[in-house]
Structures are given as C-alpha cells and as structure tokens.
Amino acid sequence: MALLDYLLGQKKKKSANLAKDRLQILLAHERSERSAPEYLPKMREEILAVISKYVTIDQEQLQISIDEANGFEVLELNLVLPDK
C-alpha cells in the first residue's frame, strides 16, 4: 500500500501536523464553551421547568445558544414539541 501511495504521490500526514490540527480543534471547542454566559445553564433549567408545566418534553432535545447578529445578542431556543 505504501508503494502505491508513493507512486500516486499521496503522502501521509505527518504526526506533527496531525497533532497541530487536533490541538486547534480542541482549543476552538474550549473557547466556544468559555464564551458562553455563566447564567446559561441555570436559564436552561428554568426554561425547561416552565415548558414542562404545559407539555411533556425530552430535556435532551432543548438547545439554547446565544449568538451575535448585527451588534445584538440573540437568544436562540430550539425544541421539538410533541404532537398533542
């Protein structure tokens, strides 16, 4: 297989480059978690409590995110509601 890779000009990615790519992904993930407001988990719990009073929902289905658009912070809530 290595001979075919050599003949076809395909090179394996060096371990240093692979480690660098993995580290960049890890850092990006940590930065995105760190930028989330501290109050978001508590807000999620409270929103779930209010919705659960009226409808039976799967708590894992609720997704809350805060994004910035046009200079404003936007709270986005995604939830699949059951059929009646």
Curated annotation (Swiss-Prot):
Name a Pfam family for this protein: MinE
User: Which InterPro entries does the UniProt record give?
Assistant: MinE, MinE_sf
Q: What is this protein called?
A: Cell division topological specificity factor
Among NCBIfam families, the record links this protein to:
minE (TIGR01215), PRK00296.1 (NF001422)
| Membrane-crossing segments per the record | none
Organism placement in taxonomy: Bacteria, Pseudomonadati, Pseudomonadota, Gammaproteobacteria, Thiotrichales
> Member of which family?
Belongs to the MinE family.
Query: Does the UniProt entry include the keyword Cell division?
Result: yes
The protein's role, per its UniProt record: Prevents the cell division inhibition by proteins MinC and MinD at internal division sites while permitting inhibition at polar sites. This ensures cell division at the proper site by restricting the formation of a division septum at the midpoint of the long axis of the cell.
**Is the Ribonucleoprotein keyword given for this protein?**
no
Which keywords does this chain's UniProt record carry? Cell cycle, Cell division
Biological process terms in GO annotation: cell division; regulation of division septum assembly
Q: What SUPFAM superfamilies does the annotation carry?
A: Cell division protein MinE topological specificity domain (SSF55229)
